[in-house]
């Protein structure tokens, strides 16, 4: 688990109250919590269930449902029943996560006093929108996939944790590691000498492409250009034709599947012999079926 840099985890007000209440209930002499009325404890969940990233979102949701069902059936905390408050930050208009919807979801969680913690969001752009709200509400969250390093960087604490305490945690590493490691792989293993860099305009895509590009240049790889894609566009022929004319050894794309699948399909037609690479945001069966 990766914790915010330079910070020590501190329990939020709600978590402290939950821990104290659970201890008191379990410790009351003569009371069998298994036979007492269960107190409902809610865990907020924010995922991109609508749009291009829905496949991963559904997988996470299903895993959470299984885990919390097992916890309830096994009386993980006697006297308490867990409920998931599942929210969707994806919209049909955006075709993927929508930061405005993510912010609305965060406000909903903070307003519900039964919500003691949160899981998510799935996407870094949603995380940037939610984190200040969760911080002000004293609600901690842990994300299974958001990797933008700025959110947990003390340098941006005023922006992303205005209340002071760190509330954003991860089960994954950040783009500060992922992007540079791909650049190292390009340089050391694939012997790439030149590369063109693209991103999908999202917080994750821009961040991971930035970190890749910085390390690629440090490793002596010549960056021939950098462009930002519109993830809603259907055709990337123009930019790929431009890249073809520059004859790079490799193409690096920072982003997720909404633009990535279309880009990969067209790239294999237009620049078939160019090495192609990208981040974990492209890990989806959609890439195999669509490209």
Explain the meaning of each model-derived region.
Residues 38, 62-86, 218-221:
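Signal peptide-proximal N-terminal region
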Residues 40-59, 121-122, 194-198:
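Short beta-strand segments enriched in small/hydrophobic residues
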Residues 1-9:
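Short, Lys/Arg-enriched N-terminal segments with co-localized hydrophobic residues
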Residues 115-225, 275-291:
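Extracytoplasmic ligand/sensor domains, especially the bilobed periplasmic-binding protein
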Residues 55-59, 74-157, 229-236, 270:
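Beta-alpha junction/loop-to-helix N-cap segments that form part of ligand/metal-binding clefts
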Residues 9-21:
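N-terminal secretory signal peptides and thylakoid transit peptides that target proteins
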Residues 56, 60-67, 98-106, 118, ...:
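Stable alpha-helical elements in mature extracytoplasmic
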Residues 30-36:
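Sec/Tat signal peptide C-region and signal peptidase I cleavage site
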């Amino acid at each position: 688990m990766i914790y915010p840099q330079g910070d020590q985890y501190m329990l939020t007000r709600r978590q402290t109250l939950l821990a104290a209440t659970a201890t008191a209930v379990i410790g009351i002499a003569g009371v069998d919590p298994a036979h007492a009325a269960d107190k409902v404890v809610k865990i907020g969940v924010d995922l991109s269930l609508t749009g291009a990233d829905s496949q991963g979102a559904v997988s996470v949701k299903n895993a959470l449902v299984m885990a919390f069902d097992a916890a309830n059936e096994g009386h993980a905390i006697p006297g308490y029943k867990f409920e998931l408050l599942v929210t969707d930050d994806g919209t049909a208009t955006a075709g993927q996560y929508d930061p405005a919807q993510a912010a609305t979801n965060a406000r909903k969680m903070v307003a519900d006093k039964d919500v003691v913690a949160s899981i998510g969001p799935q996407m870094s752009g949603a995380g940037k929108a939610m984190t200040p709200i969760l911080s002000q509400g004293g609600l901690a969250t842990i994300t299974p996939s958001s990797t933008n390093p700025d959110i947990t960087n003390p340098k941006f604490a005023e922006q992303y944790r205005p209340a002071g305490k760190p509330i954003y945690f991860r089960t994954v590493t950040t783009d500060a590691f992922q992007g540079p490691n791909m650049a190292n792989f390009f340089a050391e293993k694939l012997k790439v000498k030149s590369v063109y860099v693209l991103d999908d305009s999202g917080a994750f895509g821009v961040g991971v492409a930035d970190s890749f590009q910085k390390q690629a240049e440090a490793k002596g790889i010549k960056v021939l250009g950098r462009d930002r894609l519109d993830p809603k566009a259907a055709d990337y022929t123009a930019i790929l034709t431009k890249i073809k004319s520059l004859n790079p050894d490799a193409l690096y794309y920072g982003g997720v599947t909404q633009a990535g699948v279309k880009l990969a399909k067209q790239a294999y037609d237009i620049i078939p012999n160019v090495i192609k690479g990208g981040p974990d945001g492209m890990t989806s069966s959609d890439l195999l079926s669509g490209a």
